[in-house]
Amino acid sequence: MLNQIIDRKREDILKIKLSEDLKLPKRSFKKALLSPNRFVALIAEVKKASPSKGVIQEGFEPVKIAKQYEQAKADCLSVLTDTPFFQGKNSYLSDVKRSVSLPVLRKDFIIDSIQVEEADRIGADAILLIGEALEPQKLFELYQQAVEKGMDVLVEVHGEETLEGILNVFTPEIIGVNNRNLKNFETTVGQTERMAKLVPPGTVLISESGIGKSEDLTFVKTCGAQAVLVGESLMRETSQLKAVYALFGEDG
């Protein structure tokens, strides 16, 4: 699936027409993760659909969802901007950024410098770079470009070999372990436990995918994760406000 998405992304890049720079002020994604509202930082995802599950939320209203997440004391937001596979839009990110005070991550499949420029212009505070989608040197170049634009970078990896290849080139400030197996699409938070041993001291570790209950939060925290990225389990609920409270075992 990842290869299919990347192939499509290569085609779409050729059609990108950069929009006017919205000049929205940058917020520090990393600082928000390091000063969380709870025992582990929450990056709450604004996500309409996925390739495996189809439409997750009918009547999708990104700004309303983002405001509920903010009210529920999420630390950062992640907004899907990929259209063909996730039914996302750049405008969703810009609208969300204008409506809340939280840092916003652009969740997309970034493989080219024009996408980094685009992320900056639409108001992203951080971008996602996927280790399995890029050669380590290319990833480093895009990483540096984003940092020069004032954005943070979440470097996501699924497997040990990918992470080791990246660490041979440079040490990212933020590493996300995606708990989804790219071969069978199953998720296990045990992947965070295995990968945490490879993450250098001083790097912020995020656990992503397959997190749906408070026990998962406690488990990945004990493994060394300082933050979690949660999307589908929150988006499936009718109220994202209540969904966040439920995830943390709180009374909303």
From Swiss-Prot:
UniProt xrefs under Gene3D superfamilies: Aldolase class I
Q: Name the pathway.
A: Amino-acid biosynthesis; L-tryptophan biosynthesis; L-tryptophan from chorismate: step 4/5
Mind telling me which InterPro entries this protein's record contains?
Aldolase_TIM, Indole-3-glycerol_P_synth, Indole-3-glycerol_P_synth_dom, Indole-3-GlycerolPSynthase_CS, RibuloseP-bd_barrel
The protein's annotated catalytic reaction(s) are:
1-(2-carboxyphenylamino)-1-deoxy-D-ribulose 5-phosphate + H(+) = (1S,2R)-1-C-(indol-3-yl)glycerol 3-phosphate + CO2 + H2O
Keyword field: Amino-acid biosynthesis, Aromatic amino acid biosynthesis, Decarboxylase, Lyase, Tryptophan biosynthesis
PROSITE patterns found in the cross-reference section? IGPS (PS00614)
Instruction: Cite the EC number.
Output: 4.1.1.48
Q: Which GO terms describe its biological process?
A: L-tryptophan biosynthetic process
Give GO terms: molecular function aspect only: indole-3-glycerol-phosphate synthase activity; phosphoribosylanthranilate isomerase activity
> Entry's CDD domains?
IGPS
Where is the signal peptide, in residue numbers?
A: none
| Pfam families with a match to the protein in the record | IGPS
Which PANTHER family would you find in this protein's record? Answer: INDOLE-3-GLYCEROL-PHOSPHATE SYNTHASE, TRYPTOPHAN BIOSYNTHESIS PROTEIN
- Annotated family: Belongs to the TrpC family.
What is the protein's given name? Indole-3-glycerol phosphate synthase
Q: What is the lineage of its organism?
A: Bacteria, Bacillati, Bacillota, Bacilli, Bacillales
